[in-house]
C-alpha cells in the first residue's frame, strides 16, 4: 500500500481493545523508531503494556480508554515541526501494521519517558488495536490550503497529502 493510501485510511482512535501488540509488530515499530531517532536526533521512546500514563483525570477527560501502549517524542523545545514530521513516519508504519494511533498533546498523565537536561516531552502518540478504525474528519479543500498559478499532478498529490495530515484540533493552519 502506498503512503497516500495509508494516510487516507488513518484516523485518530482514542478507545482501544485489550489486545497486546505482537512481538513481530513491536520489532518493526522499534526498528522504525531507531531509524527515525538516528535521522532526526530526537529521542523517541515507545512503551508497551504501560497503562499508567493514560490512567489520569486528563486522559479520561480526553475520552481515552484502555491505552496501554504509547510513543513519547522527546526533544528540544524548538523541535515541534521535527516531532510532527518524524512522528507521522512512525504513525504511518503503525497504520501499515494494522494498529491505530492518536496524537495526544495534553490529555495524558505522567509518562515514563526519559527526558534529559535541555529536552522536553513534545507530544505523545497512543498506540494499539482500536475499538474502531476511527472516522474521517472534514478537511479543507485544496484551494483553501494552497495556491498555484498552474496545477500540476505533483502539486495536487502533495496538497492531497497536506489535506490528510493531522493537525491540532484539525485546524489545518498551513498558510
Sequence positions of predicted segments:
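Acidic, surface-exposed loops and disordered segments
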Residues: 1-175
Amino acid at each position: 500500500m502506498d503512503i497516500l493510501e495509508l494516510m487516507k485510511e488513518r484516523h485518530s482512535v482514542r478507545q482501544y481493545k485489550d489486545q497486546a501488540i505482537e512481538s513481530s509488530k513491536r520489532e518493526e515499530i522499534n526498528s522504525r523508531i531507531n531509524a527515525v531517532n538516528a535521522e532526526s536526533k530526537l529521542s523517541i521512546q515507545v512503551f508497551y503494556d504501560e497503562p499508567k500514563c493514560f490512567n489520569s483525570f486528563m486522559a479520561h477527560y480526553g475520552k481515552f480508554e484502555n491505552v496501554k501502549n504509547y510513543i513519547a517524542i522527546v526533544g528540544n523545545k524548538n523541535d515541534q515541526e521535527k516531532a510532527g514530521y518524524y512522528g507521522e513516519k512512525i504513525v504511518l508504519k503503525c497504520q501499515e501494521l494494522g494498529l491505530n494511533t492518536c496524537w495526544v498533546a495534553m490529555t495524558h498523565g505522567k509518562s515514563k519517558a526519559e527526558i534529559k537536561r535541555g529536552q522536553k516531552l513534545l507530544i505523545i502518540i497512543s498506540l494499539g488495536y482500536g475499538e474502531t478504525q476511527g472516522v474521517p474528519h472534514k478537511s479543507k479543500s485544496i484551494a483553501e490550503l494552497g495556491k498555484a498559478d498552474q496545477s500540476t499532478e505533483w502539486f495536487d498529490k502533495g496538497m492531497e497529502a497536506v489535506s490528510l495530515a493531522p493537525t491540532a484540533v484539525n485546524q489545518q493552519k498551513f498558510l
